[in-house]
């Protein structure tokens, strides 16, 4: 039915109007094309469902093989416990039935297939039948089996970590070092076991992650195939739609051709053409009545058969639509549950990892505390041992020093006793010449003699002390006098240097002023030569007042002595120097100022020969130097 086109029904006319027959034919063609599209889509869905079921069966077989390999591993010892709750979830849920493997026959019974372990990803599809949906006992039993081992694993891990904490506390509080190392060895064994268990759990986790990644890739491949099938279905539907449009166009063109053959070209001939066609049809009815009845019966049978097929296809399509929607809903629900389970497991794994890291940090901290305590005790022990050794050496050294001192003391005591005896004998033998004869044998005379000798000795001692004090006093006096002399000499040198510095500063300033005056005079000469005019040149103030009568050779700048820096801040008027003056102009007049009395920089004694000079002939400059007395009195 799919490979052949629509049935062509020959209608000679007379029984059914041509318009109704063409409309029914078009309806049948449309229904046929629509049913073809639905059948093709249903076929593609069935093929995709079969492929997905085959992939799911293959994945379940792989998961069962992994579970068997996991069960073949040696069981862990009860003392160690378990640290991987994910490994216990791999072989528990295995009694859930799958969907039927023949999607084209919905009346077949589903066969039970074992379910793979939950990988924690959204790529694991599971077909759930309505019986399983209505049985909450099976789902609750599966969930209980899936999440059952977690408390046991957690309890074993807590027991193992409690044992480690107990061992650490005992190790930290143990005073005996031998028992301490025993506890440390036991803790090392426990850590070795825990490390092996963690390594096994990491291997299992890596296997499960690989399986989850493989399932995810296969799920993506299935999704890609499904999308590709949907695209092919859409393309086929579009192609059938285009064929339907082409058929419609052919039918319309055939109808137009039949209408055009009955009319010559004008709209007025349409009614006459129709009447002629009706007359011809009525004439042909009488001619071929028997074959017309046979053709109509065959056409009716075919129409009934097509209607029956259409109703069956609609029913099948409805059933497949319901089944597809239910399967889609079940898959979505399963994906949601698996995602929720994956989120819960990831959260649980994160909590366990955080708890393990916290306990590991606590254990490391306790271990470091115990280690630091042991090191401190060993350091204290070594320090005490070193101190004891040092004290022993010190005691031995003091004993070695004490023995000669003891011998020396004994020797000195013996010598003192011998000297006392000799002194007593000498005192008993010697008698003073000035003492009366009655006092020789009396004890009062001996005591007076002893006192006299003591006074004489004390007097001699005092004389020697006075002599020493006198020598010290004389030495200090000579040192003081020498220091005063040096001080006076230094002060004189400082005064002389200060005077020289002051004089050199004054001369330097005078030289600067003279240079400025010469420069001004040169400028005036240049101006006079440039203008060519005669004018009266005013005399320079220094020229009128005259120069300072004393001239000294220039001296280098002196650095003041240490302690007399503030003396260099005293400024005195500079001595004016003789300057070269140009010859007076012919019409100029010289004004002679009265004599000016120059004063010395200080208020000392003034030399009458140097009191004043008149600057009439400014050619001569006195060269008599200032007395050393004035130089010395200047800075004072």
UniProtKB/Swiss-Prot annotation:
* Keyword annotations from UniProtKB, A to Z: Coiled coil, Cytoplasm, Inflammatory response, Methylation, Nucleus, Phosphoprotein
Location of region: Ubiquitin-binding domain (UBD): 452-510
Query: Can you say where in the cell this protein is located?
Result: Cytoplasm; Nucleus
A GO BP entry is: cellular response to lipopolysaccharide
Its function, per the record, reads: Inhibits NF-kappa-B activation and TNF-induced NF-kappa-B-dependent gene expression by regulating TAX1BP1 and A20/TNFAIP3-mediated deubiquitination of IKBKG; proposed to link A20/TNFAIP3 to ubiquitinated IKBKG. Involved in regulation of EGF-induced ERK1/ERK2 signaling pathway; blocks MAPK3/MAPK1 nuclear translocation and MAPK1-dependent transcription. Increases cell surface CD4(T4) antigen expression. Involved in the anti-inflammatory response of macrophages and positively regulates TLR-induced activation of CEBPB.
Q: Where is this motif: Nuclear localization signal?
A: 524-530
The identity of this protein, by name, is TNFAIP3-interacting protein 1
Q: Which residues form a coiled coil?
A: 20-73, 196-258, 294-535
Summed up, the tissue specificity of this protein is: Ubiquitous. Strongly expressed in peripheral blood lymphocytes, spleen and skeletal muscle, and is weakly expressed in the brain. In peripheral blood mononucleocytes, isoform 4 is mainly expressed and isoform 1 and isoform 7 are almost not expressed. Expression of isoform 1 and isoform 7 increases in leukemic cells.
Annotated positions of the Omega-N-methylarginine modification: 599
| Region of interest: Interaction with Nef | 94-412
Where are the Phosphothreonine residues found in this chain? 438
A GO cellular component annotated for this chain's UniProt record is: cytosol
Question: What gene does this protein come from?
Answer: TNIP1
């Amino acid at each position: 039915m799919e490979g052949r086109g629509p049935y062509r029904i020959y209608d000679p006319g007379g029984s059914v109007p041509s318009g109704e027959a063409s409309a029914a034919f078009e309806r049948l063609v449309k229904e046929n094309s629509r049913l073809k599209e639905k059948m093709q889509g249903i076929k593609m869905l069935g093929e995709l469902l079969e492929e997905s079921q085959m992939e799911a069966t293959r994945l379940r077989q792989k998961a069962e093989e992994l579970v068997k390999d996991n069960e073949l591993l040696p069981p862990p010892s009860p003392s160690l416990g378990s640290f991987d709750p994910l490994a216990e979830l791999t072989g528990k849920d295995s009694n859930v039935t799958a969907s039927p493997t023949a999607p084209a026959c919905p009346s077949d019974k589903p066969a039970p297939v074992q379910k793979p372990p939950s990988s924690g990803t959204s790529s694991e599809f599971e077909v759930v039948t309505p019986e399983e949906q209505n049985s909450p006992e099976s789902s609750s039993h599966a969930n209980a089996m899936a999440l059952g081992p977690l408390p046991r694993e957690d309890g074993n891990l807590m027991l193992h970590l409690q044992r480690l904490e107990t061992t650490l506390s005992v190790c930290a509080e143990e005073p005996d070092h031998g028992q301490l190392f025993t506890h440390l060895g036991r803790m090392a064994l426990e850590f070795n076991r825990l490390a092996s268990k963690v390594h096994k759990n990491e291997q299992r986790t890596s296997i499960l992650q690989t399986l989850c990644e493989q399932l995810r890739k296969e799920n993506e491949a299935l999704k890609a195939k499904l999308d590709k099938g949907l695209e092919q279905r859409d393309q086929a539907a579009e192609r059938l739609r285009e064929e339907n449009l082409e058929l419609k166009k052919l039918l319309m063109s055939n109808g137009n051709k039949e209408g055009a053959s009955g009319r010559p070209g004008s709209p007025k001939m349409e009614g006459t053409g129709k009447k002629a066609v009706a007359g011809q049809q009525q004439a042909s009815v009488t001619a071929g009545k028997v074959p017309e009845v046979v053709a109509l019966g065959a056409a009716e049978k075919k129409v009934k058969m097509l209607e029956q097929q259409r109703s069956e296809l609609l029913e099948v399509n409805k059933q497949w639509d319901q089944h597809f929607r239910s399967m889609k809903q079940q898959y979505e629900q399963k994906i949601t549950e698996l995602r929720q389970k994956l989120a819960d497991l990831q959260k649980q794994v994160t909590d366990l990892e955080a708890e393990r890291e916290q306990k590991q940090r606590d254990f490391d901290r306790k271990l470091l505390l115990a280690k630091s305590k042991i090191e401190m005790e060993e350091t204290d022990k070594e320090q005490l041992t070193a101190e004891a050794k040092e004290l022993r050496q010190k005691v031995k050294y003091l004993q070695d020093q004490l023995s000669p001192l003891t011998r020396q003391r004994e020797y000195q005591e013996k010598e003192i006793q011998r000297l006392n005896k000799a002194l007593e004998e000498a005192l008993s033998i010697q008698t003073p010449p000035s003492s009366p004869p009655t006092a020789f044998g009396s004890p009062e005379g001996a005591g007076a003699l002893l006192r006299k000798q003591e006074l004489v000795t004390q007097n001699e001692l005092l004389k020697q002390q006075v002599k020493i004090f006198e020598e010290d006093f004389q030495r200090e006096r000579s040192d003081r006098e020498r220091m005063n002399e040096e001080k006076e000499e230094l002060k004189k040198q400082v005064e002389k240097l200060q005077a020289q510095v002051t004089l050199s500063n004054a001369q330097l300033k005078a030289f600067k002023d003279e240079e400025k005056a010469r420069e001004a005079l040169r400028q005036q000469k240049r101006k006079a030569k440039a203008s060519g005019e005669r004018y009266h040149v005013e005399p320079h103030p220094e020229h009128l007042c005259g120069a300072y009568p004393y001239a000294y050779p220039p001296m280098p700048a002196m650095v003041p002595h240490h302690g007399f820096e503030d003396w260099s801040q005293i400024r005195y008027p500079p001595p004016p120097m003789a300057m070269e003056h140009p010859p007076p102009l012919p019409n100029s007049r010289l004004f002679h100022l009265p004599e000016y009395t120059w004063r010395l920089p200080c208020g000392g004694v003034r030399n009458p020969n140097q009191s004043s000079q008149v600057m009439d002939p400014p050619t001569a400059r006195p060269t008599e130097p200032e007395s050393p007395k004035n130089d010395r009195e200047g800075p004072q």
